[in-house]
Amino acid sequence: MNTLVLKIDAILSKHLKKQLAPYTISSQNIYVAFAAKKNGVTVLLYKSGKLVLQGNGANALAQELNLPVAKTVFEASNNSQDIPIIGSDEVGNGSYFGGIAVVASFVDPKDHPFLKKLGVDDSKKLSDKTIQQIAPLLEKQIPHQSLLLSPKKYNELVGKSKPYNTISIKVALHNQAIFLLLQKGIQPKQIVIDAFTSQSNYEKHLKKEKNHFPNPLTFQEKAESHYLAVAVSSIIARNLFLDNLDQLGQDLGYQLPSGAGSASDKVASQLLAAYGMSSLEYSAKLHFANTHKAQALLTK
């Protein structure tokens, strides 16, 4: 997938809207003046005059629309690393115990030698020991913003008749992490989010959030394998999640497993027997099926 970003004037904007009128789509982004989708390419015209084309046929559509491609601010494939990028990722969403850690990191091309020397890669490919060694070095060197939503707070916010669901809470966290990083004066050429939902669904939930920024977003599945900025965020977030999991375990006197398998069921049942439901409200995501499985284990 390619992303083209251009700056166009009012006359060209008016002409573009006329050309793409039959392909208009809705956008929840308050900074988008016009949105369309043609030939699998999403076209976003921002109120600032910035035009973004996202999709494998971006170049072809730009030529079809007679857009000034030569004036492209940047043209980047999913694995482009030659521009300053903010990348965000989250860890903990699939684990019963522990909170959710979301990190947004800013990586400039000048950081690449340092990152490659450390062996930065997707956190899922690295051992926890390696992550715990690398993460502090990254935190010191790379501008980033970390957020941790504790299990207790998660249970207050996520679920039936509550403000968020499992998708919208991640939208809120990613948006806030990126917003706070941009507030520090960071100026990326691209912002990449490890895709966990569609762009349209992301923008739908984003409309409910208080803080917004005008920068266009790139959504990429398995982005941590394509962008160093996302890989950095993946590592820092994983370390933050592990630290939180360890601290929660120390508080309760139990070693809490990562993930949502049978080991989590067993420990959860032990916590229920020792402390009652309040211990799971403090340490786990209650809406997971593990809660009912743990309760069932107590009756055996």
Swiss-Prot record:
It is found in: Cytoplasm. The keyword Glycoprotein does not apply. Gene3D superfamilies: Ribonuclease H-like superfamily/Ribonuclease H (3.30.420.10), TATA-Binding Protein (3.30.310.10). Keywords: Cytoplasm, Endonuclease, Hydrolase, Magnesium, Metal-binding, Nuclease. One of its GO terms (biological process) is mismatch repair. The keyword Signal does not apply. GO terms for cellular component: cytoplasm; ribonuclease H2 complex. It holds the Pfam family RNase_HII. InterPro entries: RNase_HII/HIII, RNase_HII/HIII_dom, RNase_HIII, RNase_HIII_N, RNaseH-like_sf, RNaseH_sf, TBP_dom_sf. Endonuclease that specifically degrades the RNA of RNA-DNA hybrids. This is Ribonuclease HIII. Its EC number is 3.1.26.4. It catalyses: Endonucleolytic cleavage to 5'-phosphomonoester. Manganese or magnesium. Binds 1 divalent metal ion per monomer in the absence of substrate. May bind a second metal ion after substrate binding. Belongs to the RNase HII family. RnhC subfamily. Its main location: cytoplasm. Its cofactor is Mn(2+); Mg(2+). GO terms for molecular function: magnesium ion binding; RNA binding; RNA-DNA hybrid ribonuclease activity. A divalent metal cation binds at residues 89-90, 194. Residues 83-300 form the RNase H type-2 domain.
